[in-house]
Amino acid sequence: MSLLDYTAVELAAKIKAGETTATEAMEAVIAQIEKSEDELNCYVTFDKEKALAAAKKADEDIKAGKLTGPLAGVPFAIKDNMCTEGMLTTCSSKILGNFVPTYTADAVERLQNAGAVIIGKTNMDEFAMGSTTETSAFGATKNPRNPEHVPGGSSGGSAAAVAANECFAALGSDTGGSIRQPASYCGVVGLKPTYGTVSRYGLIAYGSSLDQIGPLCKDVTDCATIMEAIAGKDDKDSTSIGRDDYSFTNALVDDVKGMKIGIPRDYFGEGLDPEVKEAVLNAAKVLESKGAIVEEFDLSLVEYAIPTYYTIAAAEASSNLERFDGVKYGYRTKEYEGLHNMYKKTRSEGFGPEVKRRIMLGSFVLSSGYYDAYYLKALRVKALIKKAFDEAFAKYDVILGPVAPTTAPKLGSSLSDPIKMYLGDIYTISVNLAGLPGLSVPCGKDKNGLPIGLQLIGDCFKENNIIRAGYAYEQARGRFE
């Protein structure tokens, strides 16, 4: 077994036992990056010497007993919308092409406190706006399973890096499916936690009421372990919520006997690829064979999730992105006449087409005369979607369905049709609107060998239910190759 084949938890155990070192692990990752990065383009920022120096420092601290966390010495990648002190943080945008933060995001800091060693920053859709990692100012990331296909987005660089063994695990962010969908496309595990579980301090905002940081990794055990490292109340984030229990690894139990699992009929209608449908329903049968009680039910309002999401997210984005104007940091246009012209030219030159599209949409729905008709109506529908999930979770422990309607599309096919790209988020978006946790676990491949993801959705603060179901399924499935 190659060093790169280990999961993050397995590697940490090997380092602790003295069977390998953080430096050896980092050298293996660097060799893999040098081998495949030119084709895949997973990283925006990668400094070989700094990564090696950080690994050597970790080895010294482990030897001295200073670094004892559950992820001590494990090389991690970080999505490029999380601030890292002294390391370029671009959001894959020209407008932040030279931005080096003076502080580190809370989730990244907690990860480092658990012993993780940062390799670099991964590529993403610009400002997390996209589902393919093709809107990046630094070029598209390709899917390691088949480089002619997209890795998903917006955390495509993180998912692809895990799948390509260019890191042992990574952090991503999820606003409407941006962890779960690339996890599905690349054949890795991804978790979007309950809103407020992981601090957003240091995460460059897209949709503030929807954004949440979470892990992308090789298996559910890694997922639970990373969650224990990064979750926690943070006074620097007003939306951070204190919880009684952060023991996610307690849910790593191969036992779903009596667990009630609901399958929404609405998720298996028109537009779902037959191969995806078959793989997901087969996964449900596996859980049923292990003692889970599986039933179909109707989850209303699914068809309203996409317009609701793109109204609310665009409105919040148009407000959040006002801060990027060329005054204090980031890109500034070279030639301009007066302050207003400088703002206009800087933003026109600095933002890409998809970001501009969403800023314009957001400005429109917030404008006088349209605010009530669009934005307020979307907030009301959001509340109804949450109510529909509340009613479902009164009956079920877990809701099971697909992550995406298809496997990974070919490069370029989504950019030419933005509506098609938006429709690809139909099964993930409502989870963000309701603030729920969602887990993506690989459950098969299509006829072309592209991975298919199983989505497990839990009630608020019930990550342990979906972790338990995902772990039990994984034990039956075996290692996903």
UniProtKB/Swiss-Prot annotation:
Any matching Pfam family: Amidase
GO BP field: translation
PROSITE patterns: AMIDASES
SUPFAM superfamilies, A to Z: Amidase signature (AS) enzymes (SSF75304)
GO cellular component term of the entry, any: glutamyl-tRNA(Gln) amidotransferase complex
Protein keywords: ATP-binding, Ligase, Nucleotide-binding, Protein biosynthesis
Catalytic reactions of this protein: L-glutamyl-tRNA(Gln) + L-glutamine + ATP + H2O = L-glutaminyl-tRNA(Gln) + L-glutamate + ADP + phosphate + H(+)
Active site positions: 79 (charge relay system), 154 (charge relay system), 178 (acyl-ester intermediate)
Residue ranges of the region described as Disordered: 136-157
Keyword Nucleotide-binding listed: yes
Main EC class the enzyme belongs to: ligase
InterPro entries per the UniProt record, alphabetical: Amidase, Amidase_CS, Amidase_dom, AS_sf, GatA
GO molecular function: ATP binding; glutaminyl-tRNA synthase (glutamine-hydrolyzing) activity
EC number(s) recorded for this UniProt protein: 6.3.5.7
Function recorded in the entry: Allows the formation of correctly charged Gln-tRNA(Gln) through the transamidation of misacylated Glu-tRNA(Gln) in organisms which lack glutaminyl-tRNA synthetase. The reaction takes place in the presence of glutamine and ATP through an activated gamma-phospho-Glu-tRNA(Gln).
Subunit structure: Heterotrimer of A, B and C subunits.
Family per similarity comment: Belongs to the amidase family. GatA subfamily.
Protein name from the UniProt record: Glutamyl-tRNA(Gln) amidotransferase subunit A
The organism of origin for this protein: Lachnospira eligens (strain ATCC 27750 / DSM 3376 / VPI C15-48 / C15-B4)
Gene transcribed to yield this protein: gatA
